[in-house]
Amino acid sequence: GCCGSFACRFGCVPCCV
């Protein structure tokens, strides 16, 4: 999943919003 990934946690992609 994307949530919890480096990109998501550091705001590189809007997958956790």
Swiss-Prot record:
Q: Where in the cell is it found?
A: Secreted
Which branch of life, at top level? Eukaryota
Question: What species is this protein from?
Answer: Conus marmoreus (Marble cone)
Where are the 4-hydroxyproline residues found in this chain?
A: 14
Tissue specificity? Expressed by the venom duct.
Q: Its function? A: Intracranial injection into mice causes circular motion, barrel rolling and convulsions.
Query: Cellular component terms, GO, for this chain's entry?
Result: extracellular region
| Keywords, ordered alphabetically | Disulfide bond, Hydroxylation, Neurotoxin, Secreted, Toxin
Disulphide linkage map: 2-16, 3-12, 8-15
Domain notes for this protein? The cysteine framework is III (CC-C-C-CC).
Protein family: Belongs to the conotoxin M superfamily.
In alphabetical order, the GO MF annotations are: toxin activity
Output this protein's name.
Conotoxin mr3a
